[in-house]
A protein has these predicted regions:
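Von Willebrand factor
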Residues: 23-38, 53-55, 68, 77, 287-319, 362-365, ...
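Bacterial N-terminal signal peptides that target proteins for export
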Residues: 1-12
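C-terminal motif of bacterial Sec signal peptides marking the signal peptidase cleavage site
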Residues: 19-21
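Loop/turn elements at helix/coil->beta-strand transitions in domains of secreted/extracellular proteins
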Residues: 222, 254-259, 298-299, 316-322, ...
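Acidic, polar loop-rich interaction surfaces within structured domains
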Residues: 181-183, 316, 338-354, 360-473
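Sec-exported extracytoplasmic/periplasmic mature domains
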Residues: 232, 247-255, 290-294, 308-316, ...
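DG-centered beta-turn motif at the end of beta-strands
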Residues: 228-231, 242, 261, 307, ...
Length: 569
């Protein structure tokens, strides 16, 4: 409860208002033509009717969504139903709900809600400190990005988005925030700060850790092992999306790459073993995709085990070794423990075999795949359309398959009067041993976003130090790159990437707040929060002139409209 209320208190209108005010000041335009205080950016404030990555609600990818059943939409929900769980926090997915159907009941409203003001008045500046604080930060793998696609998929279906499925750091991974490329084998560390104003004295601090540029000419040969779920639960849309992923991968392979394929349900079959591809769209790989059929139960543990056995056996010097697990995550035969299944991924990293987890399907078990890929330090994506399959495995092929640097951990040293208020990464601690480092892909950046509080006595000259520690994947040498700066220098510096990062955080945290308010405060409060977030997202989309922000605006517009129609008197 406390975490939820703190989250509600931390997100306010001041965040994007401060963003726009700063952008306006930087451009020399302090007022809008309409006197609203927002800069006149010359754009229609309404969302674009379509976008390259948006969803056409009338016929979105029908070939890959054949069994999108209407019984999960708003109209069919029982308004008197009650969910089985209490407050949906970050651990709600462990409450025994193996599929999203467990969330289809309207959330129970908790009548006894503590005063949010108690949290707002909490003094983060106490106790007084005299020494700098050193914090250790970790994001998830830079290509773990399932959460925003799952949220998009639920919104397109007309469903609620449970707060337990929102991992804000995956939203920061999914949407493009780019910095200058470093030289190969190094990282570019970019801290940026924005004063959010208000009596709380909050500032936003965003740290980008950018990997090097990867091109077709510089990528390593690939030894790819596919672990394909063909169990009965994959029937219909999940299987079609699995085929779409295999076809997308075939489009990105080249001569010199090899492919092994393990298909599994309650039995296991080696369909290809170290097959040398002939080039893009290899006929054998495409034929295998077309031949996939579903049936039987789901022994995910056995399928992953055999895939890793083949990956180890087929390792070649100088190649990149990847296992791609494609499944709806519904293990129901053999070993079903998350940790036991994930041991294959965890152990195989010692062999430099890296995991990509790909989720598909209407009953997708998000908790299982997230655990498996976390323990295996692998990327984690969700595929809701064939277009998303191509986005991930054609457009972002190098980022999803290659490794720029390994075991990235950020060390942040703050002055005593600048306190951490809210961290939007995966792990944070004053003890480096409690923070699990993760891998960074090329053509990609890890984003560490946080809100800080300026306490009395903070001086503009107070120093801030950011160090990114990491391992070279070729030499295994431990390296670090550091930036030494000050509060004043950060507040005066460039922050275009931070503007977008703030907007993404408002969107992700807003989705959490809407669901939690339905639980704690009821329909009207949730609708008001949805409308507030929509307003901030619309402002960001107008100011940033960014296609991805337009896509987010379309999603929030749809979500708030569905929320309003669902709870009309």
């Amino acid at each position: 409860m406390g975490r939820t209320l703190a989250r509600l208190a931390c997100l306010g209108v001041a965040v994007l208002a401060a963003v726009v005010a700063c952008m306006s000041a930087e451009s020399g335009d302090s007022t809008a033509a309409d006197g609203s205080g927002w800069p006149d950016v010359g754009r229609d404030s309404s969302a674009d009717a379509s976008s390259e990555t948006g969803w056409d609600r009338s016929g979105a990818d029908a070939d890959a969504d054949a069994d999108a059943d209407a019984d999960s939409h708003w109209e069919s929900w029982d308004p008197d139903a009650r969910s089985d769980s209490s407050a949906p926090d970050d651990g709600a997915a462990d409450s025994g709900a193996d599929t999203w159907e467990a969330y289809e009941a309207s959330p129970e409203v908790v009548e006894d809600v503590p005063d949010v003001g108690d949290t707002v008045l909490m003094d983060v500046c106490a106790p007084i400190r005299t020494e700098p604080q050193v914090l250790y930060l970790s994001a998830d793998d830079s290509n773990s990005q399932a959460s925003p696609v799952i949220a998009r998929w639920l919104i397109h279906r007309g469903d609620l988005v449970p707060s337990s499925l929102i991992r804000t750091y995956e939203f920061l991974n999914y949407y493009d925030i780019h910095y200058d490329y470093p030289e190969r084998g190094r990282v570019n560390v970019v801290p940026q700060m924005l004063d959010l104003g208000g009596v709380e004295g909050r500032v936003a601090l965003q740290i980008g850790v950018q990997g090097h540029e990867q091109t077709e000419e510089t990528r390593r040969r690939l030894s790819l092992t596919l672990s394909l779920d063909t169990s009965g639960s994959m029937g219909g849309s999940p299987l079609e999306l699995e085929k779409a992923v295999v076809r997308a991968l075939a489009s990105s392979l080249r001569t010199g790459d090899t492919v092994s394929v393990v298909t599994w349900n309650d039995t296991r079959t080696i369909a290809l073993d170290s097959y040398p591809v002939t080039g893009r769209d290899d006929a054998t790989v495409l034929a295998l995709a077309d031949s996939l059929v579903s049936g039987g139960t789901t022994n995910l543990d056995a399928g992953l085990e055999l895939a890793y056995e083949r990956a180890v056996a087929n390792r070649r010097p100088g190649t990149l070794n990847r296992v791609v697990l494609i499944s709806d995550g519904q293990a129901n035969t053999g070993v079903t423990s998350d940790e036991l299944i994930a041991r294959h991924a965890e152990d195989a990293e010692g062999e430099e075999i890296y995991l990509v987890g790909v989720g598909t399907g209407n009953g997708y078990d998000d908790r299982l795949m997230d655990t498996v890929t976390d323990l295996g330090k692998g990327a984690y994506v969700f595929i809701d359309t064939s277009a998303e399959a191509r986005r991930q495995f054609v457009d972002h092929f190098y980022a999803n398959m290659e490794i720029a640097v390994m075991d990235v951990r950020v060390e942040l040293t703050l002055p005593p009067q600048l306190r951490m208020q809210e961290f939007h990464g995966e792990e944070i601690s004053t003890d480096p041993t409690e923070v699990d480092p993760q891998h960074l892909a090329p053509n990609d950046a890890m984003i560490f976003h946080q809100y800080l509080t300026r306490c009395p006595g903070l001086a503009d000259a107070d120093p801030i130090r950011v160090v990114a520690e990491y391992t070279d994947p070729q030499t295994h040498a431990r390296r670090s790159d550091a930036v030494d700066t000050s509060v004043a220098l950060l507040l005066e510096g460039s922050r275009m990437q931070l503007y977008k990062g703030n907007a993404i955080v408002v969107y992700a945290e807003g989705l959490k707040n809407v669901y939690d308010l339905l639980v704690y405060a009821g329909d009207a409060a949730a609708q008001a929060e949805c409308d507030r977030v929509l307003g901030e997202v619309r402002t960001a989309a107008d100011v940033l002139e960014d296609q991805e922000m337009d896509d987010i605006l379309l999603l929030m517009t749809s979500y708030c409209a569905d929320l309003g129609s669902r709870y009309e008197p």
